[in-house]
Amino acid sequence: MAQTKREKAIKAAVVPGKAYAFEDAINILKTATKAKFVESIDVSVRLGVDAKKSDQQVRGSTVLPAGTGKSVRVAVFAPAGAKADEALAAGAEAVGMDDLAEKMQAGDLNYDVVIATPDAMRVVGKLGTVLGPRGLMPNPKVGTVSPNPGEAVKNAKSGQVRYRTDKAGIIHCTIGKADFAEDALKSNLTALLLDLIKAKPATSKGTYLQKVSVSSTMGPGVTVDQSSLTLK
C-alpha cells in the first residue's frame, strides 16, 4: 500500500537510531496521531536484566500522577464489614466473597482490576483459571492483594499501571493519552522510570535503563534521550 504524504513526512521525522528529547518525541507522536479515537501514549523500557533468571524479573506498579485517562472498573474480594464498606466507599463496582466468585465463574468479568484482602485469597485462589489468563489475578507485588482495599481501589482508579518484564527484559506500559499536556505525560513517564530504578534487581549488571521508547496507538516508536528527563 502506497504511503500518503503525511505518513512519509512522519516516517522522515524519525531518524533510526536517534534519541530525541522527550518534548520532541511527544511532538512527533502528537503529529502522527490519525485515528478517530484519542490514541494512547505507550512506553517500552528495555532493562539491563536477564529475564530468564527469576531474581532478575522486574514486576510492580506505579500510580501515575496525571492518571491514565481511562475509566477503570474494579472488583474487590473482601469479607462483609469494614473492609467491604471501605472498598465500596472508594468506588469499587463490585464487592463480595463467594457470591462474587460465583458470578465471575459464570462469566461476569467486565473488570479492569481485581483486588483482594489477604483473608479473601482462599476464595480468589479458586479462580486462577478464570482470572489468570486475563491478567486479573490479585498479586501483592502489584498492590492488588492489600489489607487496605479502599486505598488499593483509589490507586487503581486514579491511574495505577502494572508492569512486568517480558522474555526480552522489556517493560510495556501506558502513560496517558495523546490529548494529555506534555507536562502530564512527562510526569507520568518520570514516575514510572523512578519506580523501575527502585525495583532494580541486586544482581543486574551494567546499564539498567538501556532504552526508553514512546509510541502512540497507531503511530511510530520514538527513542527518548534520557538526559531530557529528571531521574533523581
Curated annotation (Swiss-Prot):
<dbReference type="GO" id="GO:0000049">
    <property type="term" value="F:tRNA binding"/>
</dbReference>
<comment type="subunit">
    <text>Part of the 50S ribosomal subunit.</text>
</comment>
<protein>
    <recommendedName>
        <fullName>Large ribosomal subunit protein uL1</fullName>
    </recommendedName>
</protein>
<keyword id="KW-0810">Translation regulation</keyword>
<keyword id="KW-0687">Ribonucleoprotein</keyword>
<dbReference type="InterPro" id="IPR023673">
    <property type="entry name" value="Ribosomal_uL1_CS"/>
</dbReference>
<keyword id="KW-0678">Repressor</keyword>
<comment type="similarity">
    <text>Belongs to the universal ribosomal protein uL1 family.</text>
</comment>
<dbReference type="GO" id="GO:0006412">
    <property type="term" value="P:translation"/>
</dbReference>
<dbReference type="InterPro" id="IPR002143">
    <property type="entry name" value="Ribosomal_uL1"/>
</dbReference>
<keyword id="KW-0699">rRNA-binding</keyword>
<dbReference type="InterPro" id="IPR028364">
    <property type="entry name" value="Ribosomal_uL1/biogenesis"/>
</dbReference>
<dbReference type="GO" id="GO:0019843">
    <property type="term" value="F:rRNA binding"/>
</dbReference>
<dbReference type="InterPro" id="IPR023674">
    <property type="entry name" value="Ribosomal_uL1-like"/>
</dbReference>
<dbReference type="InterPro" id="IPR005878">
    <property type="entry name" value="Ribosom_uL1_bac-type"/>
</dbReference>
<dbReference type="Pfam" id="PF00687">
    <property type="entry name" value="Ribosomal_L1"/>
</dbReference>
<dbReference type="GO" id="GO:0006417">
    <property type="term" value="P:regulation of translation"/>
</dbReference>
<comment type="function">
    <text>Protein L1 is also a translational repressor protein, it controls the translation of the L11 operon by binding to its mRNA.</text>
</comment>
<comment type="function">
    <text>Binds directly to 23S rRNA. The L1 stalk is quite mobile in the ribosome, and is involved in E site tRNA release.</text>
</comment>
<dbReference type="GO" id="GO:0003735">
    <property type="term" value="F:structural constituent of ribosome"/>
</dbReference>
<keyword id="KW-0820">tRNA-binding</keyword>
<keyword id="KW-0694">RNA-binding</keyword>
<keyword id="KW-0689">Ribosomal protein</keyword>
<dbReference type="InterPro" id="IPR016095">
    <property type="entry name" value="Ribosomal_uL1_3-a/b-sand"/>
</dbReference>
<dbReference type="GO" id="GO:0022625">
    <property type="term" value="C:cytosolic large ribosomal subunit"/>
</dbReference>
